[in-house]
Amino acid sequence: MYLNLYKIDIPKKIKRLYFYNPDMEPKLFARNLSRVNNFKFQDSNDLVWIEIPDIDFQITPKNVFQYKVEKEEIIKEEEDKKLFVKTLYKYIKKLFLDNDFYFKKGNNFISNSEVFSLDSNENVNAHLTYKIKIHNISNEYYLSILPKFTFLSKEPALESAIKSGYLYNIKSGKSFPYISGLDGILKIDIGNNQIVEVAYPENYLFNFTTRDAEKYGFSKEVHEIYKNKVFEGFKKIPKTLGFLNKITNLNENYQLKDGYKIFINVIYKFKNGESRYAKDVFKYSFYKNEQPLKAIFFFSSKKQFFEVQKSLKELFHNKHSVFYRAAAELGFSKVEFLRDSKTKSSAFLYNPEEFTVKNTEFINQIEDNVMAIVLLDKYIGNIDPLVRNFPDNLILQPILKEKLEDIKPFIIKSYVYKMGNFIPECKPFILKKMEDKEKNLYIGIDLSHDTYARKTNLCIAAVDNTGDILYIGKHKNLELNEKMNLDILEKEYIKAFEKYIEKFNVSPENVFILRDGRFIEDIEIIKNFISYNDTKYTLVEVNKNTNINSYDDLKEWIIKLDENTYIYYPKTFLNQKGVEVKILENNTDYTIEEIIEQIYLLTRVAHSTPYTNYKLPYPLHIANKVALTDYEWKLYIPY
């Protein structure tokens, strides 16, 4: 089996060389040397120095060595691990820049030769890109090399026929918000409300996102490129990146030890049977249901109502339709469309500009668990106003008008499933392997940052072993900080803990704390308050963007890297991507592998539809969604 890991085979030490040029300012001397060597030189009041790997490193120009001083230092890796890794990254960057690659933030290297124009939009070029990361696995260093694609404008910004929100500087590797490009003057936002004119506009290309791809009609081709060409990117590594053989051997693949590839057999328990597949819920029925499915329709105008009337009748009033069959298969006792007692109509109007309803007297009397089927005239980029302004006693289920004409059966079935997800008395399934884990509390923590506004949002979400959401807490617009505010975290943790007690009438025996990213806080403080009442705990770091992957199909497999670090590959419709999990602390009676199994199962304790899986463990998925949006998350998270 292939993994994109290559052992770094160089001495584990760094050389520091010093230079003194009496005829030039150290800052200017360092800047010139950095430019010609594609490697950063540092300076002080009198000296210039460079930290390099202990290998054959060619510094140019040759006459620079007349300024070299005798002082030379060797720093071993065990003396300064951070310096060793940092220097390796700098050297790898130099190798790429020396070989006609662009650098992009995040150790992405964009090929200037492996590039082609898109068939669906000739103004866009697809550049083969390699993302690089250094890993320490069992005290050995490895390089992961992940092929991907970057979509840039074919022409420089001022000449490009299409535009996007961001510009990429091919020299600095940085991206900036695009402001304008009038009269041959390119303006960008460099942050802190500073808008500047660009001195060298020829160095700026538009960088296109997935949203841009939808806007300009090349999203389908992007998907095809990732589906068909990433494999080629892996195969090209030994030849295209041969210059990396200075630090590794690209012809030697990482060897996975016996027993380090793990498969978890996930079994869903439904009312009338068991299956490995969530979609079999339509075969075996909801684990718990027998509720009526109540709904009410909202239209933007009478004109819209008459335009979709035929489609709606076929879908929602035909007792033999997919909608009715799906409701019966999931165990709903009946389907009921609420009608105004005065007008006898189940059709209501809303204001499409403000998203407010027009018959508030009747609407306000409606009890909980009623679906609001809202017909939208067009795609809404920001759906927050709809969620914010609609009555809280309704469960929003919006549908695009244009989708009604040829809505596919599996989408209708997913729609009915989603409705059931939002009814507290319904339970689609339970996982067989999680059935006996009711004494565990699972908590996800996410920090999202707005560097432009210099604000941070903190979110915590807690679920039980069946995926029931016990608590969600969010703190918005905190001062920008990579570290969590531990006072806030402690208060939120106590609330989640109390919600567990409220449901089960007993304290949890084990608490799983899953952090999106690394714990850079003082974990002794965290351990102190989560061990309240002698609760056992585990602290888990989750990296949702691991660089380790393969051209082999690893979906539904777990890879063990070392005793505390694993990668699982969820089965999704999208391209194969792994999630790296590191057990930082284990104070429970579970083994590390048993903890990893539960973390993986948390990706399956709930489904937004029975045809898709979550990439992240459910409490972390919730925290991630809630932290990033103000209201939109309420459309997807049943809380």
From Swiss-Prot:
SMART domains named among the record's database cross-references: Piwi
One example GO MF annotation: DNA endonuclease activity
Tagged with keyword Glycosyltransferase: no
Cofactor: Mn(2+)
Residue segments, region Linker L1: 101-153
InterPro entries for this protein: Ago_MID_bact, Ago_N_bact, Piwi, RNaseH-like_sf, RNaseH_sf
Region feature Linker L2, mapped onto this chain: 210-292
SUPFAM superfamilies in alphabetical order: Ribonuclease H-like (SSF53098)
Entry's transmembrane regions: none
Cofactor binding note from Swiss-Prot or TrEMBL: tDNA cleavage prefers Mn(2+) over Mg(2+). Cleavage probaby requires 2 divalent metal cations.
Active site: 446, 482, 516, 624
Note, other: Unlike most prokaryotic argonautes, this is encoded in a CRISPR-cas subtype III-B locus.
Domain remarks: Has 4 domains (N-terminal, PAZ, Mid and PIWI). The N-terminal and PAZ domains are joined by linker L1, the PAZ and Mid domains are joined by linker L2. The domains assemble in 2 lobes; the PAZ lobe consists of the N-terminal, L1, PAZ and L2 domains, while the PIWI lobe has the Mid and PIWI domains. The PIWI domain assumes an RNase H fold and has the catalytic residues. Compared to orthologs, the N-terminal domain has a different secondary structure and position. The 5'-end of the gRNA is anchored between the MID and PIWI domains while the 3'-end is in the PAZ domain.
Function: An RNA-guided ssDNA endonuclease that may play a role in defense against invading mobile genetic elements. Uses short 5'-OH-ssRNA sequences as guides (gRNA) to bind complementary target DNA (tDNA) or target RNA resulting in target cleavage. The cleavage site is 10 nucleotides (nt) downstream of the target residue base-paired with the 5'-end of the gRNA. Reaction rates are fastest on 5'-OH-gRNA:tDNA followed by 5'-OH-gRNA:target RNA. gRNA between 17-21 nt supports equivalent rates of cleavage, has no preferred 5'-nt.
Record's protein name: Protein argonaute
Organism: Marinitoga piezophila (strain DSM 14283 / JCM 11233 / KA3)
